[in-house]
Amino acid sequence: MKHGALALVVVLVLACVALAGDHPLLVTPAWLTERLDRADLRIVDLSDAEDYAKGHIPGALHLDLADARMQASEGVFRLPTAEEGRRLLARLGITRDTTVVLYDDEGGLHAAWLFLVLDVLGHPRVSILDGGSQRWRAGGGAWTTELPDVPRSRVVPTLRPQSDSVAGASWVRDRLDRRDVALVDARSWDEYTGRDLRARRGGHIPGAVNIEWKRHLQADGTFKPLAELRQMYQAERVTPDKTVVTYCQTHHRAAHTYFVLRLLGYPRVVAYTGSWAEWGNRADLPLER
């Protein structure tokens, strides 16, 4: 019966991925090239400002990651509130009907954070460019230093924030013994085991499995095939029938994990944004090494 239920979940997950249709979460340079002239397209470049000034995809706006990553306390970051998010979208000229494509030059690391922000805010059409600027340029994609003239949106986007996609330490602690919850630590193995100490305490949240975010990528910075990514997670018993909690040190790297799980169609992915910067500095929370 268990196997039958899991099989049904997998079928539903695959169906959800297939239903992405004209709006896949991960897009290729060819896909983007065909849509560069569309008025409802907004491209956001999350590379360093200096690199953006040297060249970017035509029409791309630059966004400093810090503008979408708010500091909650020392070393701990949070997502923008709904109001902060609406202001950010208005500044970028993004409405609910805009198709948003994100890219960087870090294997999608920075783009994944903004994907998380927009996904939690409830924007329905957000994608990441596979391979980022490197793959785009390697394939002969158009490149410019011209700054786009994008007016602020006069319409404040009306979205439906997904508040159940973000969790705090108490929420995570209260679910540590639940078999229907899986925790994924996106940090390095040395951080996971406590050898690389970046908080008062080293180690990991009890029960968490270590799948470093870099394992999602191939040598050229593109994402591994979906089948390989799916096997990677299922081998660690991180299956679609569970609520999956993602974390790292500050949830920057874990945003990459959040994106991959969404890409794979996992229906319940929860970002613990406090991550180890919070958990590792609180003596009242349990840990393992």
Predicted regions and their residues:
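Helix-loop module immediately N-terminal to the HCX5R catalytic loop
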Residues: 70-99, 213-244
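Bacterial N-terminal signal peptides
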Residues: 7-17
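Bacterial N-terminal signal peptides that target proteins for export
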Residues: 1-6, 251
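Thiolate-centered catalytic microenvironments shared by cysteine-dependent enzyme domains
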Residues: 79-171, 175, 196, 253-270, ...
